[in-house]
Curated annotation (Swiss-Prot):
Protein's name in the database: Uncharacterized ferredoxin MJ0722
Record Gene3D superfamilies: 3.30.70.20
Annotated PROSITE patterns: 4FE4S_FER_1, 4FE4S_FER_2
Domain (4Fe-4S ferredoxin-type) ranges: 3-32, 36-65
Entry function: Ferredoxins are iron-sulfur proteins that transfer electrons probably in the CO-dehydrogenase complex.
GO molecular function, one term: metal ion binding
Pfam family name, one: Fer4_7
Cofactor binding, note field: Binds 2 [4Fe-4S] clusters.
Residues annotated to bind [4Fe-4S] cluster 1: C12, C15, C18, C22
UniProt KW Iron keyword: yes
UniProt: [4Fe-4S] cluster 2 binding residues: C45, C48, C51, C55
Classification lineage: Archaea, Methanobacteriati, Methanobacteriota, Methanomada group, Methanococci
Organism: Methanocaldococcus jannaschii (strain ATCC 43067 / DSM 2661 / JAL-1 / JCM 10045 / NBRC 100440) (Methanococcus jannaschii)
Cofactor(s) annotated in UniProt: [4Fe-4S] cluster
Amino acid sequence: MAVEIIVDREKCIGCGRCYDVCPKGPLIWTKDENGKYYAYDVEYCHNCKFCAGRCPTNAILIKVVKPKKKDENKNKK
């Protein structure tokens, strides 16, 4: 299952709760130059949504992304 973690940087206050509560915290989350967190490697995310649930400003959205099939474009001419 592939996921996309979207952080609204306008809403993020840089509290670090997403990082702290995430079972894979250091593998997924990092800070930008303004001290706000973002997900830089979602490969390790298993969609527990702890980060979104703990965010005090609701700045985190997690979307399940369906991977494209390899043969999806082969039959189109």
